[in-house]
Curated annotation (Swiss-Prot):
Lineage: Eukaryota, Fungi, Dikarya, Ascomycota, Taphrinomycotina
Protein name, UniProt field: Probable aminomethyltransferase, mitochondrial
Record-level GO BP terms: glycine decarboxylation via glycine cleavage system
Protein source organism: Schizosaccharomyces pombe (strain 972 / ATCC 24843)
Binding-site positions, substrate: 219, 248, 385
Keyword Ribosomal protein (UniProt): no
EC number: 2.1.2.10
InterPro entries in the cross-refs: GCS_T, GCST_C, GCV_T_N, GcvT/YgfZ/DmdA, GcvT/YgfZ_C, TrmE/GcvT_dom1
Length: 387
């Protein structure tokens, strides 16, 4: 995958602000030292790839070894208070009461019409404390939504975390790398979706066994004053390479994961977005969350469209490509790329309910030409979460 293709993938998320107004993460100078090509993304100057590494090579390195990703542009929050669980359950469809301490779940903030304001990871630290990570591009509307609804809950406090970087380390050799770096902690007891506070050079860091590549790995919330030291120490291990936004996008697409603003948005419900699994069993019965009327109805009756995967012949499909069956437009591609792992053109998008079954033949229009395609299961590649 070349740089121009990567930039087209990232264009919908990129900031239009002048470079002088773009924010920088604590690792910005390290990116330059490592030979990064910097692009605007969600209001930040971010690395898209690094000198001497094609995006495809970076992708394959992460699948085979360990890749370091700067995700400090994402927003970190704490929600605290005796009504914290009730507050968060009022604005998400997740069953947070049942979530164990230092366990997490993928969730979504929903709006009054059942659409997704943003997708998010919610981690419970105790009955009154939650750590949340949201998308940088949704920062303003997330904050407005969180503050709007918190007024209904006495004693709940919202903190937007400042002064901390967020670093993801992903790939099959990651656990060994991290264990070598911090030998006094047994990371084998930390399973996928779990988190723990870990000391690194005298400071408290939050290690979450999670990520957005389909591989085993960690996301580390770390004070910015030691973040460069932490990242540099990891990169000193020959098994670790810095990986940019280009490969991050192809990795998450192979893993069948959504990119907010492309694959899901304010109009997409969790049900039609094939995210019904984030809706807790108890919540399906009780409802009571914003947008539950539409969402519960779609659970019962089915949505009009569904997010599915496609294999496309000959050329890669891109965001906005029309999906046709028997000459009728029945859907649209939301993400697509050549898969470095499979050597095939993969895509995800929406297709009318009834045509969403695996094996359904279709055609996808790319540059005004129709190309054969087929509905397939996601993820496109096997995932390797540590469970």
């Amino acid at each position: 995958m070349n740089r121009s293709a990567a930039l087209s993938i990232l264009k919908r998320q990129s900031s239009t602000a002048a470079s002088s107004s773009l924010k920088r993460t604590p690792l910005y100078d390290l990116h330059l030292k490592e030979g990064a090509t910097i692009v605007p993304f969600a209001g930040f100057s971010m690395p898209v790839q690094y000198k001497g590494q094609t995006i495809s090579a970076s992708h394959k390195w992460t699948r085979e070894h360990s890749g370091l990703f700067d995700v400090s542009h994402m927003v970190q929050w704490f929600v605290r208070g005796e009504n914290a669980t009730a507050y968060l359950e009022s604005i998400t469809p997740s069953s947070l009461k049942e979530l164990k301490p230092f366990h997490s779940t993928l969730s979504a903030f929903t709006n009054e019409t059942g659409g997704i304001i943003d997708d998010t990871i919610i981690s419970k630290q105790d009955e009154n404390t939650y750590y949340i990570v949201t998308n940088a591009a949704c920062s303003e509307k997330d904050e407005a939504n969180l503050k709007k609804h918190i007024e209904n809950w006495k004693g709940v406090e919202l903190e937007r975390v400042q002064g901390r970087a967020l670093i993801a380390i992903q790939g099959p050799e990651t656990a060994s790398v991290v264990q070598k770096l911090i030998p006094n902690v047994d990371f084998s007891v930390l399973k996928f979706g779990q988190s723990a506070y870990v000391d690194f050079k005298g400071v408290k860091c939050l290690f979450s066994r999670s990520g957005y590549t389909g591989e085993d790995g960690f996301e580390v919330s770390i004070p910015e004053e030691v973040s460069v030291d932490f990242a540099s120490t990891l990169l000193a291990d020959t098994r670790v390479r810095p990986i940019g936004l280009g490969a991050r996008d192809t990795l998450r697409l192979e893993a069948g994961m959504c990119l907010y603003g492309s694959d899901i948005d304010d109009t997409t419900s969790p049900v039609e977005g094939s995210l019904s699994w984030i809706i807790g069993k108890r919540r399906r019965k009780e409802g009571g969350f914003v947008g539950s009327s539409r969402i519960l109805k779609e659970l019962k009756d089915g949505p009009s469209r569904r997010r599915v995967g496609f294999i496309v012949e000959k050329v890669p499909a891109r965001h906005g490509s029309a999906v046709e069956v028997d000459g009728v437009e029945v859907g649209q591609v939301t993400s697509g790329c050549p898969s470095p792992t499979l050597g095939k053109n993969i895509a995800m998008g929406y297709i009318s309910t009834g045509l969403h079954q695996v094996g359904t033949p279709a055609h996808i229009k790319v540059r005004n030409k129709l190309h054969p395609a087929q509905v397939v299961r996601m993820p496109f590649v096997e995932t390797h979460y540590y469970k």
